[in-house]
Amino acid sequence: MHDAPLRTLSRYRAVLTSAARHGLSRWLAVTALPAVLLVPLLTSSAARVQAVGDGPSGGAVPTANWALSGSASADSTESGNPASNAIDGDAGTNWCTSAWTGTLTIDLGQVRSLDDLGITLDSASPSASATIKTAATSGNWQAVPAASNVALDPGNPMYIPLPPGTRARYAELTVYSDTGADVCVGEFRTFGPDPAAAGLDFGSDLSFTSQELAAGAKFTYHGRQQSPVQIMRENGANYVRMRLWVDPPPGYSNLASDLALARSVQAAGMKIYLDVMYSDFWADPQHQDIPAAWQGQDLAQLTSTVQSYTQQVISAFAKQGTPVDMVSIGNEIRNGILWPVGQVNDPTNPADYDNLATLLKAGVAGARAGNPAGHQLLVMMHYDQGGNNSLSQAFFQNLVTQGVPFDVIGLSYYPFFHGTISAMRQNVDALAGQFHKKIVIAETQYPWTLANGNSPIGDSTGNFVWQPSQLSPGYPASPGGQLSFLTDEMSILAQVPDGLGAGLFYWAPDWIPGVPWEPGTGIGTPNANLTLFNSQGVALPSIGLFRNPAAVCQSYDPWDVPCVVGG
């Protein structure tokens, strides 16, 4: 492990401690580029980017893991590690053989078009090899050419390309231990075009883009230098998330800079997701400060202010021809907004939500009033505990009981703070069943390395995630591990009951070394290993998470060690 994080300043240690207790807070800030400079920086290739088309993957049906909706059986199973663990969407749960070899069979329920297969062998498993077959009808097995006695690397995800035109209902995985010990498989994936995934919105929070470009950062995708906006769009993103503060310090995310970014986003052919924080600076479960200009207002006055402010903001976007498509009334509002007036001190007490509900209703009313006639505006309520169902259900039930109108359940899900991907899946499925609303992962990240990256600009700041104990079992801190985690997360959303899985947004994919987390500190970014670009701004495989994983892995240079490809 790199030792730089161990030398972190005491102030930064406090940040990590608070984040670990409550979730990844968003009070870490950097200066913003003047709004007038945003448009030329972000739209130099707008015409070409716009030609990609609407929706993820530029109109092509995205690839997802069909095994999640299938069933599994095995001829050799160790007690406590059933076959179903291999297709639950979580590489941290295992199917284990009870002998040196065993065969796992997946039934997808119907014949599917398949592009490739994915396998993660548990990191504690002995080294092993595997043979894979597929069949369109029971018993008519066809060998997979690239998976005949292929070596598996414990702990590292592997992708096996299938012959073009493969259609199958069944997939059979036979594993052979190299040592004679039992073999444990974390996940066996069957990837193919999934119409449910085509309905997902895919985007990222690009609020740092202007600062990075101003600092001299350069971003490349397969050797072509482009803006992060262009690169994300080319890889299927159809949304950009942007934060908004009321009256931030000069250069920060204010209305003028957001309007400029919105023009760039629209020019690139994407939609706008506005995160209204109702604060002059970062707002999250630890900070929800009333803006300076609103200080001293009581509940009635704040209610009026919130409604008029929200209406003015939404109207401003509409007037310049870039209407907002989705708005979050507050950011990670588990403990309320506009403290202390709208604070939730006791989440178990329904009466504690009275003031919050009043303020949220005002925000929704303002957003609806500012939205132009005929334009669809989705309203989100954003909760941070994406892996905790009991807390999530209680929060949204209180909002529903109070009559707060909203269209979308937004969740932050950082596995190093919010639990396993299985817990996230259980949460989104249960929320869909209880509330019958669209569900969006509004913020997510996973590390591609544990090293503290250095760019030509330089950065010695410790990272949010710096040690193996913070990783999710089955997902190494590598480009391949990051891709594996995000494809599993996306596949889970595509399988949410009743098609209510609505979208996935990656937080700060371009916050690479060179931009400090607080102006004037000279510290840098603690996010450098959680991006979708390496420290030199080169796009990582996860940029292409909607595509065939085997093809994505094969298209990257070996020096980057993106993932292991069989065959």
Where in the sequence are the language-model features?
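Glycoside hydrolase catalytic-domain groove-lining segments
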Residues: 228, 374-378, 390-471, 480-481, ...
